[in-house]
Amino acid sequence: MMLAVEDVLSELAGEERNERGLPPGFRFHPTDEELITFYLASKIFHGGLSGIHISEVDLNRCEPWELPEMAKMGEREWYFYSLRDRKYPTGLRTNRATTAGYWKATGKDKEVFSGGGGQLVGMKKTLVFYKGRAPRGLKTKWVMHEYRLENDHSHRHTCKEEWVICRVFNKTGDRKNVGLIHNQISYLHNHSLSTTHHHHHEALPLLIEPSNKTLTNFPSLLYDDPHQNYNNNNFLHGSSGHNIDELKALINPVVSQLNGIIFPSGNNNNDEDDFDFNLGVKTEQSSNGNEIDVRDYLENPLFQEASYGLLGFSSSPGPLHMLLDSPCPLGFQL
């Protein structure tokens, strides 16, 4: 055990002890085997250990939430010596009741071996504290591991009120799950900031589904620069009608639905002028010959509710002029 050596070294160095009797930085986290073969055995056969302060408590007279203040060892887990209180003078059943509730055993007792699977040295019992009285007690987060000697070690101690050593702790939350959720939230937050700052055009669903054929016919679509203007007149009017129809066929149906909302008169033809709206032309001719400003329609609250629903938003993310001034997927601009 290195604790005694560290005690001597810390005293020679003049280190200040903490309130638990350990040098700064030391924590009391013994294994199941160490609790039984060293601490419990020393208590039973030698009355305890010099310099190791583990409190003796009567677990039937103390509620679990009172135990941390009584402990001399442990921070998140608290350790105690206790005498098993027999329920009946001639019986072997243990009294587990307190004033506010009772300890109830859960699962089977676990065998504790020495040397990684060697000799059986003791048993470990897990108990959970319930408020109230059985069988209608209310389960709490307080858990106790009770360790006792077994086999040859237990036969050496003939006293019926045998000593046990207990580890008590409160399961007030699964730290692994909390950590996972925190990491997920941090990832989503950082990913959102990165996407908004560097790839703002990815905030909307893709309106173009590229294919190998399209990328061959239109090399400019290979570039993913949101500030590059791909809807110039040279591109539109210098291309054949076949190529334009091929490009129009790749437009997501969302665009067609938006056009249907803005121009319900069915003024959609299969010519190049009709295709101009999808590529950024902001005016259109109505059925009576008057020029229509597309922004008037886009700023209409009824249109905003309908169009954002088609784009997958539950509600409008902000003023529409911000969306109009922002880069759209693959260079398209509304």
Curated annotation (Swiss-Prot):
One of its GO terms (biological process) is organ boundary specification between lateral organs and the meristem. Induction: By BRM, at the chromatin level, and conferring a very specific spatial expression pattern. It comes from the Eukaryota. SUPFAM superfamilies: NAC domain. The keyword Transcription applies. Changing residue 30 to S: In cuc3-102; cup-shaped cotyledon and abnormal SAM. GO terms for molecular function: DNA-binding transcription factor activity; transcription cis-regulatory region binding. Gene3D superfamilies: NAC domain (2.170.150.80). The keyword Lipoprotein does not apply. It is found in: Nucleus. One of its GO terms (cellular component) is nucleus. Residues 22-171 form the NAC domain. InterPro entries: NAC-dom (IPR003441), NAC_dom_sf (IPR036093). Keywords: Developmental protein, DNA-binding, Nucleus, Transcription, Transcription regulation. In a general manner, present at the boundaries between mersitems and araising primordia. Residues 121-177 bind DNA. The NAC domain includes a DNA-binding domain and a dimerization domain, and confers the specificity of the transactivated target genes. Transcription activator. Involved in molecular mechanisms regulating shoot apical meristem (SAM) formation during embryogenesis and organ separation. Required for axillary meristem initiation and separation of the meristem from the main stem. May act as an inhibitor of cell division. PANTHER family: PROTEIN CUP-SHAPED COTYLEDON 2-RELATED (PTHR31744), PROTEIN CUP-SHAPED COTYLEDON 3 (PTHR31744:SF86). This is Protein CUP-SHAPED COTYLEDON 3. It comes from Arabidopsis thaliana.
